């Protein structure tokens, strides 16, 4: 039995800080396994790794989890000092999404201490900030829980029932390679023209990566760029747009070397997980906000396998991926209480 508010706050601060101290940009999630295994043991939870490298912290009856609290172990690149200042935690992933992950682990512990009637787990997935291999593995193996709460920052009062889709286009341009005094245009010039035409054509397009050149006095023969676009329309419309954009690049001696698409997701507020989250927030005296988030998450993938899915978590999403990521310990605790209550509601509904 969990004994006091001070005890829970202490657990939240220590757990979250331990997670933040381990730098885990996409591809290095295994660094977090020893920390998660130690905390699982301390909190009386089971611990295992699946074939994709996803971490599973389990509670309740044996078997595949019926209810899953799904977070991710990776962060975007960019090391930040992990520290606790007063009651605020700072560090890479404080908001996206180790703060929510800590809240989910604590929430599972709280629910388990009261007794869970169904198999439940925190699933720490790999590669969410990349191509979501952890989520795709769950779906392809048929191991997706019946009810899923995705742990992403929603301000602690938001229930996200949708995410936009994402279209990523890799562009490669060629041009004259030689001395910069040569009048012939290099690949970088071609790339600038190509990107200008894309940005003029569609305001949703954003250039996220550029690579060209080796020296100030050499025009590069090859230049690369990545363009990302978020959208609400059906994925087939986005693919048609990508095809048109790529066709238009040939006049600039450029082409699309790859196109990747993540479809948008929009679930019903009446699904069991969303209803349980709303009920838990209201019980806690919080007025729920129903939101459709502007980015993407593993919810875009996992929604293929279940309709009972929604996202919720502590933290200001505006701080995600910034150098100012921070989260209050109290917000982690409040979210843990919401997760715990939601787990109980969903288990009791079976």
From Swiss-Prot:
Stretches assigned to coiled coil: none
PROSITE patterns in the cross-refs: ARGE_DAPE_CPG2_1 (PS00758)
Keywords from the UniProt entry: Amino-acid biosynthesis, Arginine biosynthesis, Cobalt, Cytoplasm, Hydrolase, Lysine biosynthesis, Metal-binding, Zinc
GO biological process: arginine biosynthetic process via ornithine; L-arginine biosynthetic process; lysine biosynthetic process via aminoadipic acid
Annotated residues for binding of Zn(2+) 1: 72, 96, 152
Subcellular compartments: Cytoplasm
One GO term describing the cellular component: cytoplasm
Catalytic activity: [amino-group carrier protein]-C-terminal-gamma-(L-lysyl)-L-glutamate + H2O = [amino-group carrier protein]-C-terminal-L-glutamate + L-lysine; [amino-group carrier protein]-C-terminal-gamma-(L-ornithyl)-L-glutamate + H2O = [amino-group carrier protein]-C-terminal-L-glutamate + L-ornithine
Comment on bound cofactor: Binds 2 Zn(2+) or Co(2+) ions per subunit.
Cofactor(s) this protein requires: Zn(2+); Co(2+)
Chain positions recorded as Zn(2+) 2 binding sites: 96, 129, 321
Keyword check for Zinc: yes
Function: Catalyzes the release of L-lysine from [LysW]-gamma-L-lysine and the release of L-ornithine from [LysW]-L-ornithine.
The protein's name: Putative [LysW]-lysine/[LysW]-ornithine hydrolase
Lineage: Archaea, Thermoproteota, Thermoprotei, Desulfurococcales, Desulfurococcaceae
């Amino acid at each position: 039995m969990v004994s006091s508010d001070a005890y829970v706050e202490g657990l939240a601060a220590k757990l979250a800080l331990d997670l933040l101290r381990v730098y885990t940009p996409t591809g290095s999630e295994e660094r977090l396994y020893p920390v998660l295994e130690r905390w699982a043991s301390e909190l009386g939870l089971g611990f295992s790794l699946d074939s994709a490298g996803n971490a599973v912290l389990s509670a309740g009856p044996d078997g595949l989890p019926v209810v899953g609290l799904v977070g991710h172990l990776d962060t975007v690149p960019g090391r930040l000092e992990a520290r606790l200042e007063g009651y605020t935690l700072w560090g890479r992933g404080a908001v996206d999404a180790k703060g929510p992950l800590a809240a989910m682990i604590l929430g599972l512990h709280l629910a388990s201490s009261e007794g869970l009637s169904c198999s439940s787990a925190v699933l720490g997935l790999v590669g969410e900030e990349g191509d979501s291999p952890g989520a795709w593995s769950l779906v392809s193996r048929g191991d997706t829980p019946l009810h899923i709460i995705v742990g992403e920052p929603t301000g602690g009062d938001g229930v996200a029932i949708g995410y936009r889709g994402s279209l990523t286009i890799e562009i490669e341009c060629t041009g004259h390679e030689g001395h910069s005094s040569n009048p012939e245009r290099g690949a970088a010039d071609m790339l600038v023209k190509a990107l200008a035409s894309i940005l003029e054509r569609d305001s949703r397009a954003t250039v996220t990566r550029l690579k060209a050149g080796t020296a100030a006095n050499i025009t590069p023969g090859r230049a690369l760029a990545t363009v990302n676009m978020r959208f609400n329309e059906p994925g087939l419309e986005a693919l048609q747009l990508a095809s048109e954009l790529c066709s238009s690049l040939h006049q600039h001696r450029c082409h699309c070397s790859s196109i990747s698409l993540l479809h948008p997701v929009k679930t019903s507020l009446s699904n069991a997980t969303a209803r349980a989250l709303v009920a838990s927030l209201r019980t806690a005296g919080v007025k729920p906000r129903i939101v459709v988030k502007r980015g993407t998450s593993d919810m875009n993938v996992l929604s293929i396998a279940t309709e009972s899915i929604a996202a919720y978590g502590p933290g200001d999403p505006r701080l995600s991926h910034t150098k100012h990521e921070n989260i209050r310990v109290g917000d982690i605790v409040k979210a843990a209480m919401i997760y715990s209550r939601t787990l109980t509601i969903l288990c009791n509904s079976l």
